[in-house]
Amino acid sequence: MTSFGIIVFPGSNCDRDIATVTAGLLDQPTRFIWHQETDLHGVDVVVLPGGFSYGDYLRCGAIARFSPIMTAIIDHANAGKRVLGICNGFQVLTEVGLLPGALIRNRDLHFICDRVTVRVESNQTVWTKGYQSQQVITLPIAHGEGRYFADGDTLKALEDNEQILFRYSNAQGELTTDSNPNGSLHNIAGITNVQGNVLGMMPHPERAADRLLKATDGLAMFIS
């Protein structure tokens, strides 16, 4: 059994979607953790869900990084335990420094709600062992500030350390401008920390995990 702790900030709106997968579909112990709590006792995997934490005031994730629960999340990550940030959760992880870079306004400055094809770069991680390396999967996206940006040295380190776990691609797995929905540098859709236990991604695997929706490409993320 894997115990999931789903962080709930003011403005989170994908927390119950994740619980539907972890508790409803997979029957794993799951609890909601309000952002003012300070204890992650008994939690194996921390999930920071999508949404608009604190209304995205100042900058996406900029206020959530100061929530009391973040100290415990940082300790959890530094202990080598798993932390997953999806969409707004990814933004929070960059703001708090658990992942490098930043998520900025989409290339066309519009909110994007669509399904995209994403290439799994490696299956040699705890998050992707249920996939094949270079496998192309389809996942939903819904964001206005999902364009990954980092300086040249950071991008080189991400490439050299194989921290880029997901890239936007076409159905054949080719990295093209047309298949990059938001202008992310290096077609980045998701990255890990150097140790590989912290993952941030803009696509929503929890929205592609139920056979009733005829979309299950994201389910392996939660089984891994």
UniProtKB/Swiss-Prot annotation:
Its main location: cytoplasm. Transmembrane segments: none annotated. One of its GO terms (cellular component) is cytoplasm. Pathway: Purine metabolism; IMP biosynthesis via de novo pathway; 5-amino-1-(5-phospho-D-ribosyl)imidazole from N(2)-formyl-N(1)-(5-phospho-D-ribosyl)glycinamide: step 1/2. The active site is at 87 (nucleophile), 204, 206. SUPFAM superfamilies: Class I glutamine amidotransferase-like. One of its GO terms (molecular function) is phosphoribosylformylglycinamidine synthase activity. GO terms for biological process: 'de novo' IMP biosynthetic process. Pfam families: GATase_5 (PF13507). It is found in: Cytoplasm. InterPro entries: Class_I_gatase-like, PRibForGlyAmidine_synth_PurQ. Its EC number is 6.3.5.3, 3.5.1.2. The keyword Nucleotide-binding applies. Signal peptide: none annotated. Residues 4-224 form the Glutamine amidotransferase type-1 domain. Keywords: ATP-binding, Cytoplasm, Glutamine amidotransferase, Hydrolase, Ligase, Nucleotide-binding, Purine biosynthesis. It catalyses: N(2)-formyl-N(1)-(5-phospho-beta-D-ribosyl)glycinamide + L-glutamine + ATP + H2O = 2-formamido-N(1)-(5-O-phospho-beta-D-ribosyl)acetamidine + L-glutamate + ADP + phosphate + H(+); L-glutamine + H2O = L-glutamate + NH4(+). Part of the FGAM synthase complex composed of 1 PurL, 1 PurQ and 2 PurS subunits. Part of the phosphoribosylformylglycinamidine synthase complex involved in the purines biosynthetic pathway. Catalyzes the ATP-dependent conversion of formylglycinamide ribonucleotide (FGAR) and glutamine to yield formylglycinamidine ribonucleotide (FGAM) and glutamate. The FGAM synthase complex is composed of three subunits. PurQ produces an ammonia molecule by converting glutamine to glutamate. PurL transfers the ammonia molecule to FGAR to form FGAM in an ATP-dependent manner. This is Phosphoribosylformylglycinamidine synthase subunit PurQ. The gene is purQ.
